[in-house]
Amino acid sequence: MPRRKQQAPRRAAAYVSEELKAAALVDEGLDPEEHTADGEPSAKYMCPEKELARACPSYQNSPAAEFSCHEMDSESHISETSDRMADFESGSIKNEEETKEVTVPLEDTTVSDSLEQMKAVYNNFLSNSYWSNLNLNLHQPSSEKNNGSSSSSSSSSSSCGSGSFDWHQSAMAKTLQQVSQSRMLPEPSLFSTVQLYRQSSKLYGSIFTGASKFRCKDCSAAYDTLVELTVHMNETGHYRDDNHETDNNNPKRWSKPRKRSLLEMEGKEDAQKVLKCMYCGHSFESLQDLSVHMIKTKHYQKVPLKEPVTPVAAKIIPATRKKASLELELPSSPDSTGGTPKATISDTNDALQKNSNPYITPNNRYGHQNGASYAWHFEARKSQILKCMECGSSHDTLQELTAHMMVTGHFIKVTNSAMKKGKPIVETPVTPTITTLLDEKVQSVPLAATTFTSPSNTPASISPKLNVEVKKEVDKEKAVTDEKPKQKDKPGEEEEKCDISSKYHYLTENDLEESPKGGLDILKSLENTVTSAINKAQNGTPSWGGYPSIHAAYQLPNMMKLSLGSSGKSTPLKPMFGNSEIVSPTKNQTLVSPPSSQTSPMPKTNFHAMEELVKKVTEKVAKVEEKMKEPDGKLSPPKRATPSPCSSEVGEPIKMEASSDGGFRSQENSPSPPRDGCKDGSPLAEPVENGKELVKPLASSLSGSTAIITDHPPEQPFVNPLSALQSVMNIHLGKAAKPSLPALDPMSMLFKMSNSLAEKAAVATPPPLQSKKADHLDRYFYHVNNDQPIDLTKGKSDKGCSLGSVLLSPTSTAPATSSSTVTTAKTSAVVSFMSNSPLRENALSDISDMLKNLTESHTSKSSTPSSISEKSDIDGATLEEAEESTPAQKRKGRQSNWNPQHLLILQAQFAASLRQTSEGKYIMSDLSPQERMHISRFTGLSMTTISHWLANVKYQLRRTGGTKFLKNLDTGHPVFFCNDCASQIRTPSTYISHLESHLGFRLRDLSKLSTEQINSQIAQTKSPSEKMVTSSPEEDLGTSYQCKLCNRTFASKHAVKLHLSKTHGKSPEDHLLYVSELEKQ
């Protein structure tokens, strides 16, 4: 049969102008109330499609028939009355125009058609709104009765082929229903959710994940996105509009079985969060409802698929967001004269509010957390977000704002004024560590930003208390002759004490315009990511520890990967926590000369410089080995920097000619406290709490000294943005993911070799005597492992020495368990091979600031140290701070609510109930009621609890053949495990006697003994299990060990520790608190 011709969908009532509505009502002489009553019957008496196709083909193609069959059935959840008004209006216009054309084919077909078919045709025809006055009188009683039945089931999916269903009979029954008052039950509806599959998340679990194709139910065409499927359904007419209003007045009409409807109610709330129109925010019960809504309202054309193209004319700010946007600048606006006045913010919001879309409904409150709509939201309030915090100027793009901040230096003023006033900046709350650093003299060294790092970096990087102070001689041969405006130092005295000959270069807007095209996609992606983070933070629903839009973070174009690029220059992302100003100066870096040409396509390798680098590395190794033998441990400066992929400008040329006195501290190889002879005071970075893991994905594969080797920095097309995103994501997820190393990269091989040489040098030299006390030591320890947790304990060295005044980056990690880090204070001359790159240090100090915004409760477990240098002197002197660990790091056994003594009694009773068969296998027999009574009376456990414990044990034994204290029962060779001392016993009788030795009484005496007697016996009894366990030399001294928590005794220290961990859930660190040693008798 030919498919029904599809009429172009109307706009929803929300988009019909008020003048048209008024005109339509005047033409027809109807008020809205009459029309509302009218709309019902028109939807109910739909013309049956199949019968009509045979009976009156010419009528089928007329617009009036299409309107009645398809359009009048549009009582969607949006606005019932206004939708009906729109139906009425368009229907009346069409019917006036084409009444004559419609009636002619009707006369032709009356001869051949039966009386029933004619009734159906005329009823359908009269149900049009053109005949509304007649219709009102003719069908009002029927509509009242039939209201609930036909709309009882809300929408179902779109395929609806059923040969057994009689369309004609159903239509006639509905038409003549006014006659029979007794028929209250509805016809079985073809579109009810019982007969058809719902496209719900339970049946099609993967449909919302993007893993599956979106298929059209009618023609099975597959589409990648829901929008494409919606467009297809619109063009081909492969959908049926079942958006009836649900009838709340008549619950008897509910067509679903009760159990089914309850099951569907479970996931209804979750489904409505997903099945939401991204334009208007309405929720729908099924995917088909959503698709029909999108088709009828054309909303799918209004949702930006990936990125905003043009700003929306009417800026949509829902009323519920007004308060949130008012708070945008308050936390970080400085009180300086240039600060944005608060009044202008509210005025702007009022202006935006007046322009806002009049059709926003209360449901819209959650409409912007969904899909691509965060891009809309960003466009709507771009002027609020992209605003300079210092002078209040708005910008259209992040690039312009960044250029403005760089050129004017406003980011320094904003941060400094906020710090002077003592106001915390939102991204970097002032922690106690900052206050300890205020006394130290600091020189702020802000550095130039590249175009590409701008979206993600925030004022956190500018905090003057975190800036790096570096003492170096710049190699003049390699100095670039461009003009480099020198940064003014804030305190005058600092210029005298710090001999810095570095020059700084701020990017101009012209530089930004010359940026290579390849970086723009990344900029947009990062811009979207930051935008969504802002929106989620304002909405109050951050997830992933501040990275709300994980989907946006991974929607990045596949960039060309350079061998250096995989681990090199990538931007760390920082979400704005409740703050909307994206001020994005780059990481503060020292002594970076500007790139000579920003558009160089490929870095040229200077092999002569590479040879020099190799020579310098080998020389430094030799010097390290010599210096390590000196007792005072003077350190030789390194020439090498190993930046983290989180640092933003890795490839720019770094001039490094360090003097022999002031070196750089390495962040990679071995624990490295500084030497005392250093004079330069430098602020230490805020320590990150124990257990926070900062990921350094390819830390050792690329060195900052590649700048010596490359004439030009690698440009953005060779950046792998996913490595930066992954590293920051992993910080929040607590995972230490290691991306694959570039195997054939000569640079990475070179620096791996130098790392291993330095490590060998550290291990080969015996640790000298510890001549200085621990308080002279810097408490920041580092080692090579990429995935070790951080244990940066707080405190600063007495003389404020850090070699070369380098800011210590919180990425480098110190194992809490390694006390060797202190003893190897003088040994750690491998210092010279650690990273001296201020790039990495500042990038990672920013990330540490971001971590402070996360809750303390998410700290992850510390992993065990694996570097060789740590293992060398594990038993050396200990630091109090190094042994402090957070509760989350402590190893917790399984928490059991059982009293261990009760478990022993139950296990012994169960073992006693095992019966051995003639084949040698054991079978379980139940405990007698008397035995259970004795256990219950003694232990205080209820009979029900005892029965449940026994049933659980039997179930586990039948299902898996073993349980916690008994394995291999089904094989005939059972193994019994003692919970207390981890002994393994082969026979039930031995096991029972062993448990009785722990308990201090025999099970057969259980009924005779009183609780007091048993407790006294337990206290006096010494465990005979000492004979079974082979004692270690430390236990030959005539001691046994008693648990203070339950007064049981054990033969070995290992046994009591095992008992404390398994039974009481105590950490190994706390074992000494709960164990008392007893003299053997």
Swiss-Prot record:
Comp. bias intervals (Polar residues): 335-364, 581-603
UniProt superkingdom: Eukaryota
DNA-binding region listed in the record: 891-961
Zinc finger (C2H2-type): 214-238, 275-299, 386-404, 976-998, 1041-1064
Cell location: Nucleus; Cell projection, Growth cone
Sites bearing Phosphoserine, chain numbering: 682
Coiled coil ranges: 606-630
Extent of Basic and acidic residues compositional bias: 238-247, 473-491
Any one GO CC term of the record: nucleus
PROSITE patterns per record: HOMEOBOX_2, ZINC_FINGER_C2H2_1, ZINC_FINGER_C2H2_2
Family as reported in the entry's similarity comment: Belongs to the teashirt C2H2-type zinc-finger protein family.
Disease: TSHZ3 haploinsufficiency due to proximal chromosome 19q13.11 deletions causes a neurodevelopmental disorder characterized by developmental delay, absent or delayed speech, intellectual disability, and autistic features. Some patients may have reanal tract abnormalities.
Protein name from the UniProt record: Teashirt homolog 3
Organism from which the protein derives: Homo sapiens (Human)
